[in-house]
Amino acid sequence: AVNNGAYQNDKRIFVNNYTLENKESLVNIDMWPAAKYNLYPIEEEIGKKSYTVTIGSIIRAGIGVAKGDFTLALFPGTKDKNCDIAAIKIIVEEAGGIVTDLYGNEQRYDQPIKGAIICNKNVYNKALTIVKERIKEND
């Protein structure tokens, strides 16, 4: 970790400190029918207490986490977006957040990935538990 911080237009940015227990918490969950990982059951659970959206861009959602606009972003992709998640990992972690695969592991970004959890440190353990309990792999 470099630990020089994340910046937007020369202004330091930080992840927010919200939890998943209130509607102030904005969560992006990318979903599409052919994705390797089915996140619909996860959205159903998280949506009980947090406001969930699907904006259709994991890059924009990841930057939203880094800036504090989003509390959590979940990504079900495996191929072709590994370089996008690699960039988001650097930015979000420099802003004080966490990025792992959907199972809570570090991953390499020069090969297919196992999705991504992108969030602040306050929600990581709760998000990981919800994901692990409900994740389903599509064939």
Give the label of every model feature segment.
Residues V15-D139:
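An extended, acidic
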Residues A1-Y7:
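DPxDG-like acidic metal-binding loop motif
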Residues N9-K11:
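Residue-level detection of beta-strand-connecting loop/turn positions
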